[in-house]
């Protein structure tokens, strides 16, 4: 049975909380095995499992890392999250604008995450 908009928004809220807390184990549990993340900047899809390592590294490098929500919306197939990624990185303050468009299956698990971000806005991560 298809998810309601309320269920989709609850899913997004849990995902955002786990992302902000640096808990990739929780975000992974919200995905089907083999879920993919597509990046706009290189037009490539990677296994969602590899993004957990990136999330962990980012939280280690930026103790005050956070995703400040600008907009959230349920879509016909999942949800959309627009956020500003902020924090104090080794090379200074970061403010990277991000949009994630997530596709959920009928069980409420992520099958696809499309991420739109300009990686140059994260250059301060490299110190």
Which residues does each PLM region occupy?
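Alpha-helix C-capping/helix-to-loop hinge sites
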Residues: 15-18, 38, 86-87
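Phosphate-binding glycine-rich loops and adjacent basic patches that engage nucleotide phosphates
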Residues: 11-21, 45, 61-65, 119
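A beta-strand edge to alpha-helix "cap/lid" segment located at domain peripheries
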Residues: 2-3, 53-127
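Short non-domain terminal segments
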Residues: 13, 39, 111-114
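Short, low-complexity N-terminal intrinsically disordered segments enriched in polar/charged residues
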Residues: 1-33, 127
């Amino acid at each position: 049975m298809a998810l309601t908009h309320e269920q989709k928004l609850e899913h997004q809220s849990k995902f955002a909380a786990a992302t902000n807390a640096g808990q990739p184990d929780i975000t992974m549990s919200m995905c089907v095995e083999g879920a993919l993340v597509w990046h706009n900047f290189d037009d490539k899809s990677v296994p969602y499992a590899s993004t957990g390592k990136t999330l962990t590294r980012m939280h280690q490098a930026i103790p005050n890392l956070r995703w400040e929500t600008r907009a959230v919306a349920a879509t016909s197939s999942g949800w959309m999250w627009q956020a500003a990624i902020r924090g104090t990185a080794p090379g200074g303050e970061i403010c990277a604008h991000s949009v994630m468009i997530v596709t959920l299956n009928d069980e409420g698990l992520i099958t696809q995450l499309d991420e739109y971000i300009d990686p140059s806005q994260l250059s301060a991560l490299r110190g």
